[in-house]
């Protein structure tokens, strides 16, 4: 198994770990103004693309 020849510096370690952050979820508004995830049915009013698709 390969073994590191040199110790990884604190700067390189922290630079690599800075990419581990969580992404902020993208949000959109449905036609009635509720905040939803894009391309999903609104859980509050049951509409998708200005059509009623769920009975809520």
UniProtKB/Swiss-Prot annotation:
Identify the SUPFAM superfamilies for this entry. Answer: Zn-binding ribosomal proteins
Q: What is this protein called?
A: Large ribosomal subunit protein bL32
Any one of the GO BP annotations: translation
Domain of life (superkingdom): Bacteria
Looking at the record, which segments are called Disordered?
1-24
Q: Where along the chain is composition biased (Basic residues)?
A: 1-20
Does the record carry Ribosomal protein as a key word? yes
Q: Does the keyword Secreted apply?
A: no
Family per UniProt? Belongs to the bacterial ribosomal protein bL32 family.
Q: Which UniProt keywords apply?
A: Ribonucleoprotein, Ribosomal protein
Q: Could you state one GO cellular component term attached to this entry?
A: large ribosomal subunit
* GO-annotated molecular function: structural constituent of ribosome
Note the Pfam families from the entry.
Answer: Ribosomal_L32p
Provide the taxonomic classification.
Answer: Bacteria, Bacillati, Actinomycetota, Actinomycetes, Frankiales
């Amino acid at each position: 198994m390969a073994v590191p020849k040199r110790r990884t510096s604190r700067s390189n370690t922290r630079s690599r770990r800075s990419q581990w952050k969580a992404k902020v979820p993208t949000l959109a508004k449905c036609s009635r103004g509720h905040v939803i995830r894009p391309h999903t049915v609104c859980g509050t009013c049951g509409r998708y693309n200005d059509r009623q698709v769920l009975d809520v």
